[in-house]
Amino acid sequence: MLRKIVDRHQDDCPEVIAAQTFVFRVIHLSWLKNAMLRRIATNLIGLVYCLLNCHKNIPILNFSFAYLKRLPSTISLRERIKIARIVLRNTGIYELIRRYDSKETIVVLDEGFLQIVHYLFVYESMAPDIKQVDKLLSQIPIPDAVILLSAPKRVLKERTLARGHDRIKAGSSEAVEAFISHALEVFECLKASPEIRQRLVAVNSCSNVQPFVTNGDQSSDVNRIIEILISGCIYGRA
């Protein structure tokens, strides 16, 4: 869906652009095409911008690392280090986008601060601590609009079993069931946040894109995002 949306609106004003494309344009690395090198560069750029702006995000970073330190031994050190890297990278990428974004661009970010919530709290072997989820949500910046792609739990389970998931080591039906249940529990917590609800766009299919709240409390950006999503879907089918 992201590619369809970007392709449909890349020549518009404001331009719709994927976050990684935006980052590489700002850093003058658009010439870099190799997927692995782009992933490495994204991690390094995110780390640098996180370090340069860490004073702005001390509460978030302190919370994240303290929570990772308290995790039970069932969560391996390797997994914790990976999550810590993602926290640093996503924080840095957010700061870069915030610094260079303008009214001429709409940056679509598929791994931002809200994705940090998923990485920190969703595990196969333990249920999420909802109180801690709420605490982190009170500290992180919320984007102008949040897109929620929904699918029945059965479909999510089938897709995960078919594709595999690097955070579900066992790969069994029971392990996948537990991981998805914990993920859905965290997403319900996100949807319950007043700040997120008014910026949330629910996508069940290309023909079912609508604001999560319909009582007039939604963000002014939501209707514009809905138009972009629907036109991107139609363009992709044409």
Predicted regions and their residues:
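N-terminal phosphate/diphosphate-binding loop that engages ATP/GTP or pyrophosphate donors
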Residues: 2-75
